[in-house]
Amino acid sequence: MALYEHVFLARQDITPQQVDALVEQYKGVLEANGGKVGRVENWGLKSLTYRIKKNRKAHYVLMDIDAPAPAVHEVERQMRINEDILRYMTIAVEKHEEGPSAMMQKRDRDDRPRRDGDRPDRGGFGDRGPRPDRGDRDDRPRRPREDRA
């Protein structure tokens, strides 16, 4: 059997429980056709780069699949029919990655400083420093005006 990574995007207006039900439905299809589902990662509701079928957000789900090609084709056929699925992509891989995917690692980064001023290396002005005093304008002579006729 071949190894696949399968990602699908579900509509924004369905609940997370309905997304889990979709995952279970497609797991059942794969197992009925002789396949197995390894890791399932729900990446949550994320903004789309562009609108897809009038949706600006979507639920992202990653599934690691070990199944024969006909089982994968059946899952893709059912996803084409389902109106809750906006997009899907199946990629054949040599082996499945261990641990969390890159998207989950990005979410788990707690060592990054927050953007709300939690950066000790900068003052309150970013990296510019304090603003110079602008009280020197009264010391300069006014420029002569040229009257235009």
Curated annotation (Swiss-Prot):
Region (Disordered): 94-149
Organism: Sinorhizobium fredii (strain NBRC 101917 / NGR234)
Database matches in SUPFAM superfamilies: Ribosomal protein S6 (SSF54995)
Keyword Ribonucleoprotein recorded: yes
Annotated GO MF terms: small ribosomal subunit rRNA binding; structural constituent of ribosome
Pfam families: Ribosomal_S6
One GO CC annotation: cytosolic small ribosomal subunit
HAMAP family from the UniProt entry: Ribosomal_bS6 (MF_00360)
Role: Binds together with bS18 to 16S ribosomal RNA.
Protein family (similarity comment): Belongs to the bacterial ribosomal protein bS6 family.
Keywords from the UniProt entry: Ribonucleoprotein, Ribosomal protein, RNA-binding, rRNA-binding
Protein's GO biological process: translation
Entry keyword Ribosomal protein: yes
Protein name: Small ribosomal subunit protein bS6
